[in-house]
Every structure is written in structure tokens, then in C-alpha cells.
Amino acid sequence: MNILSIVNIPLTLVEIPPTGENTFEIRINDELILIDFSDHLTIEKNLEKYRLCFKYHYTISDHSKYTNIVPFSPVSFHDWNLYNLGRKNIHYTCNNDIILNNQRPGGAAIERRTTVQRMLRDRYGNRIDTRFCKKQDDFFHLINNCLVSVCVPGARNNMLDRGQFQYMALGCCTISPYLDEVLAGGVPLKPQLHYIVCRPDYSDLIERIEWCKLHRDRCISIGRNAANLFAKTSTPNAIWSWILSKISTR
């Protein structure tokens, strides 16, 4: 809802019956729309009730067969001032050998995040930064002095995690398994263009990091592509334009 308030859309909050565990309804121009913010690939049971369902973490393989499910960019920034400040103050130059992996192991990702951190520490020692930053601004400023950020997704191993999405928005090159996701505007994430892909079991992660050391200009280009993708698809204005374009299509 903060996206709509930022683009100065008047909002009226009303109490409505619950829809699902990870969904809510919104009415725009007298049309009832479903927002599905689940991290998972589940489908709302009463999907046929809605002409449009905007789905976070939309994948072509799981959702394209449903004509009323529309891709939607997942949550990135709650405070958009941090994004605007970050665009001015965060400058990814890839001029350092520090490798970022600032994710706390937990939930569905506890095993793989612990395994990846152990792998990175064994190989790179004190060149790995695994600190957890309580302040978002501190987390973003780590970008200024890193080689690359290794991102291990949370609920699923092939989903776009919020931290990775924020880093992409600010122009940092990231490494993760293949992200089978489509953002608002119907634009897919593309490996080697918007991020560097590694195997799902991270067995080639060290190889990918070593590649970054040898191709720093390419890393900068990937980070820039990611930032441009975010600006095109996932800012409040871009998302609102996408919503309007789908509502007007009948």
C-alpha cells in the first residue's frame, strides 16, 4: 500500500472478510482485484472470482497457464527515501575483493545458507563479510566496497529474495541460483544480464566468484543492467503504470 500512497493515489481502508493466508483484495476503479504476496507458488483457491490476480514471484512454468494471474514485482523497499538516497550515494565499483553474504541462516534456508557461508569462509577467510546489518542504510553501503554479493534465497532456492532485489536496485552485481521469476511489466530476470547464475547446489560458486575477479567491468555492467531493470519495472510509478495497463485491458 505504501507504493500507492507514494504515487498519491487516495486510499480508503475497509474491513473485509479474509481471502487467504497470503492474499488480500483491493478495489481500483470499482474493480475487485486480488494481490497474492506469497513467497511460494501456490494458487488462490477462489481464483476464478477475480478477473485479475497480481502475483508476487510469478513464474512462467507455474502461472502462465492462468489467464487472470499477472506478474507483480515482490516487496523491495518499505522506505523509498532509502532507495532514492541509495541511487545518489551507493556506487558499485567492484574495486575490492570483499565478498558479501549478509544473510542470517534461518527458516527454510538455514541449511543452505549455513553451508554457503562455511564454503566461503573456508576459501576466502576474512575477505567474506557475513555481518548482519540492523540498519538498512548500513547494509546498502556495503555495496561500495565489495567485489560481488552472494545471495542465497529464503523460502525457495529459486526465488528473488528481498535483499538481493534491493542490491540489484542499487546496481550491485549478485550471484544466486537461477531465478525463475517475472516482474511487473511482464519482464523476466535474465541470468548473466541482470545477475550471475550458479548451480542450485552452489557447487560452482567459487568458480563464479573467481570469474568476477577477472571480469570486473562485466560485473559493473550486470549491476547497471539490474538497476535499470528495477527502475523500469519495480518503482512505485512503474508498478502503478503496470496496474493501470492491466485494469484498462478488458
List the predicted regions and their residue ranges:
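Nucleotide-sugar donor-binding catalytic core of glycosyltransferases
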Residues: 1-191, 233, 237-241, 245
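Alpha-helical packing segments of well-folded alpha/beta enzyme cores
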Residues: 116, 139-142, 208, 222, ...
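Short amphipathic alpha-helical surface patches that serve as generic macromolecular interface elements
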Residues: 161, 192, 202, 206-209, ...
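Hydrophobic, well-ordered secondary-structure elements that form the walls
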Residues: 167, 195, 226
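Short, contiguous hydrophobic alpha-helices characteristic of membrane insertion segments
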Residues: 174, 193-201, 246-250
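C-terminal "capping" alpha-helix adjacent to the active site of nucleotide-linked donor transferases
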Residues: 196, 201-218
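A charged, aromatic-enriched C-terminal amphipathic alpha-helix characteristic of glycosyltransferases
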Residues: 217-247
